[in-house]
Each structure stands twice: as C-alpha cells, then as structure tokens.
C-alpha cells in the first residue's frame, strides 16, 4: 500500500486496493473465510464512516477510538455493517499492523517518552544480566517503572537528587488506591528493584526512598494453597476426550501443568529438542532463574505429548512443541493461549469457580506429590523453588501428617 500525498496526515493511506491487500494478507496468515469476511466488513464500515467522500482514509488512534467508542454505540448506517465492538477493534488493529509492516503508516507511538524508554532498556539489561528475571516478570516491572518515572519526572530528565520520600508516598497513594495487597506488592517490588538498580549503576542515594515504599499487608504462608482434588482433576481431564486436534494439544498442555507443575510460560517455551524420549526427561530452559533444569517425564505426560505430535500437530516450521491451531498459524502458543486453554477446560468440566488459571494446577501438582509421599525437598526440586521456604506452604495441606502431630485441645477432647 502506498502512503497518500503529503497534504494528508502521516497515518493516511489510499483507499484504492486497501481492502484487497488486507484480505489477501489475512488469507496468507491462515484466517478462515468467516473471520476474514467479518474483519473485512468491519474495515469497510470504518472507511465508509471515516472517509465517505475521499480517496484516502486516516488509520490513526484518534479516529479509530472515536469510531469504536462513539459511532458503534449508536450506529444507524444503512445495510448490515459489522457493528461488533470486539470484532471491529481486532479488525482495525490487524489493519494497522499490516500497514505498519510495509511502512504505509508510521510505527505505533511509544508508550513512554524517549528518555524513559532508554532508562527502561538499561534496567532491562541489568535485570537480565544480574537478576535473572523471568520474561513475564520483566515486562510487568517495566510497565510499572515506566509509570513511576512518568509521574515523578513529568518534565523530563532523571534527577533523583530532587526526589524525596514524599514523592514516593504520593505515587503509591495515587497509583495503588483500591488495590488488593498482592497488587500493591507487585508495584512496590517493581519500584524497589528499580531504585536498587539506580544505586548500583549510578550511585544514587536511595536509602530514604526505599524506606518510603509501603509494605503491603500480606503475610507469608498466611493462606492455604488452593488446589483441585482427585475427583476435580478427573473431571478436568475427561473434558479433553473429544478426538479433535486442538483438544489433543490442549490435553497435552494441561498434563504438563498438572503432572510437572510447569508455569504457563515454561510450557509455551518448550521446544521439540527439549524432550529426551529415550531417557524420559524434559528440559526446562526458561525458568524464573534462567537455569536449565531436567525433569523426569511421566509416562502419562509423555503419551499425551506424543499423541499430539504424531496425530494432531499441524505442519509447521516452528520448533515449538505446542503451536497455534487458529490464525495466525505457524506460530507457537503463548502464555495467554495456555490461560485460555485452562479456562475453557474449567468451563467444560464445571470448575469455573474452582479453577481460574494455570497456577492453581501447579499447586495441585505439588499437593498430589505431597499426598503421594514426596518430601518437601523433592517437591521443591520438581517445582524448581530456589528456597525450601517457598515450598513449605504445602505442608499446611498435608492433613494426614498434620493430624499425627496435633495436640489435644486443653481441657477437652480433640
């Protein structure tokens, strides 16, 4: 697609040939006729509203937001245009991505000012090289640190000599209002990590600032780890009995979560070469501490993976074990897909109130190992906890062993 003439805005493109190029690209990425037609109708609707008498259309954030938030709410366009908000938003995001890929419109504007983006990159290098943060943790911390710096230094420049404890407290009072303790702790950990980075790399005096970061009222080991019992796990696994390629993939994914206690991003990162069929082991290369761990591969888990690879995995050049079965094809699944797999399985098996995401299956794996006689050290090795203190919480759900050491209630019968 060609950019329109110089009198138009930077996000303006010629309408001629746009729809044809758009649908052809979607077909090439594996989108089916129904999805392609729905997206095509949404883009046509946007063009008819945005540029009814022009040969160019502005594909910028402002007109897209007005179209979705204002026009679709009270649309009275003739015919049967695509009016679904979610479908329209997805269709226009795809259009922007396609046009940016061939330089028809400029790249998306950065989330933060340039000086903050540069600082975030320095922090990311430090976090990777020194701290060994998991990718998902680093992404979350970058977002919170970016918001922190944007609020603290709105005029540009990073002058920490001008920042005092009051500024820290005001940021948390505003940003974390109404947050649960766990969410506040995430923000606090991000800001604390960044200030320590400043002290190490730039010798900034941050002691008073660190002391001003609030401590969330969240006590370690205070709660019980939520897990599924054997009957609930059986119901969950029975929801994959349909001989559908995607269900076979999803079954293998959930077996990795239930049998090995893998995290969602670890399952997504598995590659074909990580499976040693001869020795029945699985190599996990993308853990939280950037270690390479070799885990035993249970027979039931290996069978589920082998069944998927031999019978259901689509032809692809990707070396990922688990790949997408819906457009965009020829790409590995990500943590979001795995969360969706678990939630859909929970809905099918009537466990919506009990199973909210993959991490509860990690708790279930640990609890099953404990009930099977494994020691806390063995569980810590499988879950790859760096400290036994992290694993100690599972001792609270071992009722058999707890009953053996329980003392009678004073003055009564236990």
Question: Where does each model-flagged region fall?
Answer:
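Conserved catalytic core of the tyrosine transesterase superfamily
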Residues: 1-414
């Amino acid at each position: 697609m060609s950019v329109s003439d110089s009198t138009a805005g930077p996000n303006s493109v010629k309408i001629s040939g746009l729809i044809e190029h758009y649908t052809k690209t979607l077909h090439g990425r594996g989108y089916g006729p129904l999805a392609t037609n729905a997206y095509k109708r949404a883009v046509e609707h946007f063009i008819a509203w945005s540029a009814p008498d022009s040969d160019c259309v502005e594909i910028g954030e402002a007109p897209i937001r007005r179209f979705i938030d204002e026009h679709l709410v009270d649309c009275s366009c003739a015919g049967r245009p695509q009016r679904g908000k979610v479908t329209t938003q997805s269709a226009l995001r795809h259009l922007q991505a396609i046009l940016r890929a061939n330089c028809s419109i400029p790249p998306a504007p950065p989330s933060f000012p340039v000086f903050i983006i540069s600082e975030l990159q320095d922090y990311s290098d430090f976090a990777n090289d020194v701290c060994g943060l998991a990718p998902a943790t680093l992404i979350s911390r970058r977002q919170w640190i970016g918001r922190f710096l944007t609020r603290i230094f709105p005029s540009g420049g990073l002058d920490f000599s001008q920042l005092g404890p009051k500024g820290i407290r005001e940021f948390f009072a505003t940003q974390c209002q109404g947050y649960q303790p766990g969410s506040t702790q995430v923000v606090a950990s991000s800001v604390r990590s960044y200030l320590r980075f400043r002290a190490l790399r730039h010798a900034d005096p941050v002691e008073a600032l660190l002391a001003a970061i609030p401590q969330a009222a969240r006590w370690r080991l205070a709660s019980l780890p939520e897990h599924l019992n054997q009957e609930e796990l059986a119901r969950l696994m029975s929801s994959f009995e349909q001989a559908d390629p995607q269900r076979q993939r999803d079954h293998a994914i959930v077996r990795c979560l239930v049998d090995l206690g893998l995290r969602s991003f670890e399952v997504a990162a598995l590659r074909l070469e990580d499976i040693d069929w001869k020795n029945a082991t699985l190599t996990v290369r993308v853990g939280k501490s950037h270690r390479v761990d070799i885990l035993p591969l249970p027979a039931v888990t290996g069978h589920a993976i082998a069944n998927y690879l031999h019978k259901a995995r689509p032809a692809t050049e990707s070396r990922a074990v688990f790949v997408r079965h819906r457009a965009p094809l020829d790409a590995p699944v990500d943590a979001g897909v795995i969360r969706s797999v678990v939630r859909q399985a929970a809905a099918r098996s009537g466990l919506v109130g009990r199973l909210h995401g993959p991490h509860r299956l990690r708790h279930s794996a640990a609890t099953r190992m404990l009930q099977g006689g494994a020691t806390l050290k063995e569980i810590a090795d499988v879950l790859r906890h760096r400290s036994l203190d992290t694993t100690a919480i599972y001792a609270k759900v071992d009722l058999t062993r707890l009953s053996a050491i329980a003392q009678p209630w004073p003055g009564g019968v236990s």
